Amino acid sequence: MAIKKIGISARCDRPEIIGKVREILAHFSSRVQIFVATPTAEVLGMEGTPVERMREEGVELIISVGGDGTVLRNIAKMKDPLPILGINMGTLGFLVDVEPEDALETIEEVLYGFSYSDRMRVDVFLNGEMLETATNEIAIMSAKPAKIIQFEVYVGDCLLDSMRADGVVFATPTGSTAYAMSAGGPIISPRVNAIVVVPVAPFKLSSRPWVIPSDSEITIRLSAPKKEAVIAIDGQKSYRIKLDDVVKLKKSRFPARFVRISDTCFYERVQRKLT
């Protein structure tokens, strides 16, 4: 086989997902070395390896068993993400291409060699300190429910817009089918290097979604005193910001990597998921 070492990481709170992991381990453990992520291994009663250490162990790809959230959590643990193959045990699943009944056959094919697509990510900085890297989106929302915030968005040195809104979403092409789409933003092909800026329930009708080049440096500042906001990164981690804070977004040097499945067409897949 071309692939010698793989990793596997799963959502651990659903028995059917753990059952699928056991099935994968039983089928492939004698043919390829499998490193099981620590939380998953604890449920299985075996020795585990942190996802963030799998690259140094020589792992060539990670099988993520769960939904989109599981994929995002796995990617977030790695500075330079390994290729991910997602097994869809969730609901909609834009980041998980393989259905449970096809898992063994697909993994069998992938073990003989695979290609992957790079997906841009965005580094998030607060007052010059890097917080996280987003694969899907950065959402900035009011810290208090049902309250609007006022903020300015700059692209480079140019003011893009001064907004009063419930918030704003900055999405990668990968994240354009998530929160940004629900807020009225466009769907962007992952082959396009761009960042989508989508106001959430803006006060003025002239505040519209924008698509800007991925190499742009974006700056966000709150402009109303005594109001705080929250930055949510991929729906996983959040940070509070206040009036004098400066948020900057920059394209990351380290993309996410998704294993290509031969019969996968982005446009057909999106249409299928949305119907």
From Swiss-Prot:
Involved in the regulation of the intracellular balance of NAD and NADP, and is a key enzyme in the biosynthesis of NADP. Catalyzes specifically the phosphorylation on 2'-hydroxyl of the adenosine moiety of NAD to yield NADP. Transmembrane segments: none annotated. One of its GO terms (molecular function) is ATP binding. It comes from the Archaea. One of its GO terms (biological process) is NADP biosynthetic process. The gene is nadK. It is found in: Cytoplasm. Belongs to the NAD kinase family. The active site is at D68. This is NAD kinase. Coiled coil: none annotated. NAD(+) binds at residues 68-69, 73, 136-137, 147, 164, 166, 177-182, 201, 236. Keywords: ATP-binding, Cytoplasm, Kinase, NAD, NADP, Nucleotide-binding, Transferase. It catalyses: NAD(+) + ATP = ADP + NADP(+) + H(+).
